[in-house]
Amino acid sequence: MKNCNIIRTFFRSLLLQAVWNFERMQNVGFLYSIMPCLKEIYGADENRLKNAAIRHFDFFNTHPYIANTIISLTLILENEKVAPTGLPSVASEEIKSQQIKSLKLHLSGPLAAIGDTFFWARIKPFCGIIAAGYVFVRGINNINYFLVPLVFIFSYNIPHIFFRFFGFWLGLKYATDVVKIISNFKFQKISEIIRIAGIFVCIFVLVVYLMSSVKYQFIGVLLFFVSFVLIKKNVSIILVFWGLVIGCVGAGFLM
């Protein structure tokens, strides 16, 4: 496949969710993404191109940021169906078509679960915490009204775009071996690290906010050291965080 068509496919994949329907979900976006490469693979054979388009117009639904792995893997498998002469191998065409359909179906579910957990439940809240923390640390003024949304947009979209590109590259390079590579990724461990980091950022922002006022400086320092000691003693970081919140609210009423 030509590099220009591969690049076009990648940029088209950004529009995967531009057209939704409740019957087949992301099927229109999927077919739109791979169409440039399908046209190159099948050339002037309009009948086989039409059959391929109908085949990929079937149900498809996964996490949009990790869908690129399935898209590039599908293109590799479609390309392998074509003999050196440029015509599909009739003997193996039906078998490979079923293999492609099966891989799309069996990969879409697990990848959707990984993406939902990693991006919706971890990355997005973490970037929101960073943006909110920026307000508490830097204060609210006319400049920060514009900077805070930019902090969130950049902190979220850098990993998001990276995973789109990296997943697309993995599918092109490793084909069906990408399944084994993805299974070896420690998504659960990384998600847990992000969760803990997010709570630490919340604690840090809370302490900095308290210390910004002379009246609450002592409380800020005290809460920081208490949090550090409790975490060192393996107390749940979530309990530490909510303890800090309740403590701050109580201190506010007392003072």
Language-model features: locations:
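Juxtamembrane inter-helical linkers in multi-pass membrane proteins
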Residues: 90, 94, 169-187
